[in-house]
């Protein structure tokens, strides 16, 4: 049996082919799995569980089918969908996990994160993250009208694109990649803090398997891929793990 781990699907009505691929993935792989973990950014935008969305409705119904059949489903919020709450979780049949958290995968304690916590060189993003994850901010934000929340979300996305463009203009390609990737010292500190030898995260859209030494211990950091040009899934079982690509329909 296998545990499946994915992230960064960024499901959006403007990219129906990715939703189609995700639903096919559920049909073909999840029904026989030990568990499915979604480590954030399942959706491109999420402004509250009361947000009308045909894509979200379709996804919830599909996930619920497998939850009802006995497959454990877990969701860790990402930077795009950290407002996914208890109402949607109940509809979809998944359990919301804290970021970060440690789970046991076939006897191996494994640290799961979305991944943005490790990108501390991007100071502006970390400040925005701290502001928007504050419980008081969230509570106040969710009292606003849907139109007001949508306007804030659109403005935040424009600001994010402008920030990324600014970083590209102000830095050469090597420095830009460094700023927008994880900070090695933070990775090492996270391993040491949680006392594990394996970490799995998404966010950076740079799928890879990294081997490193932390305090003389051999550690593994797995980076999940995004679902833009293809799908990406990490398959974990008692024998190890494999990163696989999924071809888009058509």
Curated annotation (Swiss-Prot):
Protein purpose: Hydrolyzes the pyrophosphate bond of UDP-2,3-diacylglucosamine to yield 2,3-diacylglucosamine 1-phosphate (lipid X) and UMP by catalyzing the attack of water at the alpha-P atom. Involved in the biosynthesis of lipid A, a phosphorylated glycolipid that anchors the lipopolysaccharide to the outer membrane of the cell.
Pathway the protein takes part in: Glycolipid biosynthesis; lipid IV(A) biosynthesis; lipid IV(A) from (3R)-3-hydroxytetradecanoyl-[acyl-carrier-protein] and UDP-N-acetyl-alpha-D-glucosamine: step 4/6
Localisation: Cell inner membrane
Binding-site positions, Mn(2+) 1: 8, 10, 41, 205
GO molecular function list: manganese ion binding; UDP-2,3-diacylglucosamine hydrolase activity
Enzyme class: hydrolase
Cited InterPro entries: Calcineurin-like_PHP_ApaH, LpxH-like, Metallo-depent_PP-like, UDP-diacylglucosamine_Hdrlase
SUPFAM superfamilies for the chain: Metallo-dependent phosphatases (SSF56300)
Protein name: UDP-2,3-diacylglucosamine hydrolase
UniProt record similarity statement: Belongs to the LpxH family.
Known catalytic reactions: UDP-2-N,3-O-bis[(3R)-3-hydroxytetradecanoyl]-alpha-D-glucosamine + H2O = 2-N,3-O-bis[(3R)-3-hydroxytetradecanoyl]-alpha-D-glucosaminyl 1-phosphate + UMP + 2 H(+)
Co-factor binding details: Binds 2 Mn(2+) ions per subunit in a binuclear metal center.
Cross-referenced PANTHER family: UDP-2,3-DIACYLGLUCOSAMINE HYDROLASE, UDP-2,3-DIACYLGLUCOSAMINE HYDROLASE-RELATED
A cellular component annotation (GO) from this entry: cytoplasm
NCBIfam families: lipid_A_lpxH, PRK05340.1
Domain of life: Bacteria
Record flagged with keyword Transferase: no
Chain residues that bind substrate: 79-80, 122, 160, 172, 175, 203
Organism: Xylella fastidiosa (strain M12)
Record key words, sorted: Cell inner membrane, Cell membrane, Hydrolase, Lipid A biosynthesis, Lipid biosynthesis, Lipid metabolism, Manganese, Membrane, Metal-binding
């Amino acid at each position: 049996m296998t545990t499946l781990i994915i992230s960064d699907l960024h499901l959006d009505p403007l990219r129906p082919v990715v939703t189609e691929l995700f639903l096919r993935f559920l049909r073909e792989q999840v029904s026989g799995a030990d568990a499915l973990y979604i480590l954030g950014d399942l959706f491109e935008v999420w402004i509250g569980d009361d947000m009308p969305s045909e894509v979200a409705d379709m996804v919830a119904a599909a996930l619920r089918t497998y939850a009802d059949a006995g497959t454990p489903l877990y969701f860790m919020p990402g930077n795009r969908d950290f407002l996914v709450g208890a109402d949607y979780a109940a509809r979809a049949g998944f359990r919301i996990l804290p970021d970060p958290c440690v789970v046991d995968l076939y006897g191996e304690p494994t640290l799961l994160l979305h991944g943005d916590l490790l990108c501390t060189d991007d100071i502006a993003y970390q400040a925005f993250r701290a502001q928007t994850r504050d419980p008081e901010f969230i509570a106040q934000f969710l009292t606003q009208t849907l139109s007001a929340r949508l306007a804030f979300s659109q403005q935040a996305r424009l600001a994010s694109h402008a920030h990324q463009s600014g970083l590209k203009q102000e830095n050469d390609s090597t420095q830009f990649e460094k700023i927008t990737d994880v900070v090695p010292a933070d990775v090492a500190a996270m391993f040491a803090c949680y006392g594990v030898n394996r970490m799995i995260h998404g966010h950076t859209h740079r799928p890879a398997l990294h081997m490193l030494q932390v305090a003389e211990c051999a550690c593994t950091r797995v980076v999940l891929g995004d679902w833009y040009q293809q799908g990406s899934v990490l398959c974990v079982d008692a024998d190890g793990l494999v990163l696989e690509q999924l071809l888009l329909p058509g």
